[in-house]
Amino acid sequence: MQNSPIPSPWQFIKENIPLLMVALVLALLLRFFVAEPRYIPSDSMLPTLEQGDRLVVEKVSYHFHPPQVGDIIVFHPPELLQVQGYDLGQAFIKRVIALPGQTVEVNNGIVYRDGQPLQEEYILEPPQYNLPAVRVPDGQVFVMGDNRNNSNDSHVWGFLPQQNIIGHALFRFFPASRWGQLGSFTFVPARTIINT
């Protein structure tokens, strides 16, 4: 029995170029149209997301339905931030607080949506600022970071056009100790205690 000659590295590459090209095209299609990895560069989403976390952002679902309250989204900066020097290629990550037609207000450390106080168990601390009631226009959303007092978000620059949304942050894959699905948070109006 004879041993087959070992192919040269060049011959191996030449024989596998079509396979490598198909793999590259598939990887690029997935990256640009289905999902992409993202790195968290700031503390604006503490305690939900920490600086250095790495996420998978899916890009398909918002083509079939709009974002929902509680979704954590990744988006390109709106026009006001671009005027301030942010590049359109940069990405932000925040939580959707209100949808078109809803009102948002921040008063005495409480966020209100449509006049109802929100019970926000995921925030780092209550906001130390006030925001008069504003109505979200059609085609836009109101977003806030979970680290309310250290977040450049809609309370600073206004509404986010839905066309700026890149995708929905679904899964943290790094660090391994915090690995898991992010999901959406269901907002529950705060309970009012009435003393009788």
From Swiss-Prot:
EC number per UniProt: 3.4.21.89
GO biological process, one term: signal peptide processing
Reaction it catalyzes: Cleavage of hydrophobic, N-terminal signal or leader sequences from secreted and periplasmic proteins
Entries under Gene3D superfamilies matching the protein: Umud Fragment, subunit A
Cytoplasmic side of membrane: 1-16
Segments on the Periplasmic side according to the record's topology features: 36-196
Gene Ontology MF terms in the entry: serine-type endopeptidase activity
Main location: membrane
PROSITE patterns, sorted: SPASE_I_1, SPASE_I_2, SPASE_I_3
NCBIfam families reported in the protein's UniProt record: sigpep_I_bact
Name of the protein this chain belongs to: Probable signal peptidase I-1
Source organism per UniProt: Synechocystis sp. (strain ATCC 27184 / PCC 6803 / Kazusa)
